[in-house]
Regions:
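Charged, non-catalytic interaction/linker regions at domain boundaries
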Residues: 1-214, 218, 222, 230-234, ...
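Charge-rich, solvent-exposed alpha-helical interaction surfaces
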Residues: 70, 178-181, 251-255, 268-275, ...
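Positions within ordered alpha-helical repeat solenoids
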Residues: 222-225, 297
Length: 331
């Protein structure tokens, strides 16, 4: 018997998804990450319900109606959506030494699921169009006992929320790319912190917009910081390719002379931009400055409404440079 954590997230950026769609993003003996259309998602939901029939044999008429109403609501609300499905199973024999308090205070499933979610959402975001909303909405999370593939006991309740954001059709080629990226980044230390932070910015309805913005900003900040070891080499290499009287040469030379390799965040970003995105340095540099100013103003007490925090712009800028990094690593 396994103790299983099952999570489901609605893609905010996909509409009119094929209802029978099913792709494995990742799968091993105990962990599964899938993309599902509505019919496939509903199959899993109904199989879970049928597996619990013995437990629910004594349900009242009202309780049975509530279950039917929940299934009806799923069909009404989510019939055209796609879902990210995460299934993490741990054999009961590996958990039985824990007391109930030890197990449920911090279930070991959660870290495993978080790592899978981080890698999957970062990979998918990197492989979809930049104009598509990268956010997700968690619509369910539950712990179950499963034996021989059948759920026999439920430890938590199903939760459903609704949220609508701009979307696009699903392109299967994007998922082919996302699977390749997932394999490249999953469980690698250099990506773990970055993708973990970024993925937390993708669930604004659960984490609140402020927390999502902080997560997006921190993912960008940490990404830049982790590139520190490359910056000196990047900068010196760029100087060789430029004329002494160009603005870029003078700016980079000034940074190197004044900071002696100890760069401020803004300077680090500029140097990375010269390496990854030389044709649009000024545009990206100004965008980074603008986002950083809003972030600093907010945390120094300026009255800024949370809805005006540049969450999507920060996600977009991170996505852009994350893709540059992936391209350099996947060649």
């Amino acid at each position: 018997m396994d103790i299983v954590l099952i999570q489901a997230f609605k893609f905010d950026g996909i509409y009119d998804a094929p209802q029978n769609y099913e792709r494995d993003i990742y799968k091993d003996d105990y962990n599964i990450v899938k993309m599902l259309g509505f019919t496939k998602y509903l199959d899993i939901f109904e199989n879970k319900i049928s597996g619990l029939n013995d437990e629910r044999r004594n349900l009242t008429h009202i309780q049975k109606e509530r279950i039917e109403s929940e299934i009806h609501n799923l069909k009404v609300i989510y019939h055209s959506n796609a879902f990210l499905y995460i299934d993490v199973a741990i054999p009961y024999d590996q958990l039985k030494h824990l007391s109930s308090e030890q197990l449920w205070e911090k279930p070991p499933h959660l870290e495993l699921a978080s790592n899978l979610f981080s890698a999957a959402t970062s990979a998918i975001t990197a492989c979809r169009a930049s104009i598509v909303s990268p956010s997700y909405e968690k619509i369910s999370e539950g712990f179950y006992a499963r034996q021989n593939g059948v759920i026999i006991k439920e430890f938590s309740n199903y939760n459903i929320e609704q949220n609508d954001i701009s979307m696009m059709h699903l392109d299967d080629r994007e998922i082919d790319s996302a699977i390749a990226v997932f394999k490249h980044i999953y469980d690698k230390k250099e990506f773990k912190t970055i993708t973990s932070l970024f993925s937390q910015s993708l669930i604004p309805t659960e984490n609140a917009r402020l927390f999502s913005f902080i997560s997006a900003w921190r993912s960008l900040e940490v990404f830049i910081a982790k590139s520190q070891q490359d910056i000196q080499e990047i900068s010196l290499g760029r100087l060789k390719d430029k004329s002494d009287d160009t603005p870029d040469y003078k700016f980079i030379k000034k940074i190197l002379d004044v900071t002696d390799g100890k760069y401020h965040l803004l300077q680090r970003f500029y140097l990375l931009a010269t390496y990854y995105n030389e044709n649009n340095i000024e545009e990206d540099f100004n965008e980074f400055q603008s986002i950083q100013k809003v972030r600093n103003d907010y945390f120094h007490g300026t009255n800024i409404d949370q809805k005006d925090l540049p969450l999507e712009r920060t996600q977009k800028l991170f996505r852009k440079y994350f893709i540059f990094k992936l391209h350099s690593g996947l060649k």
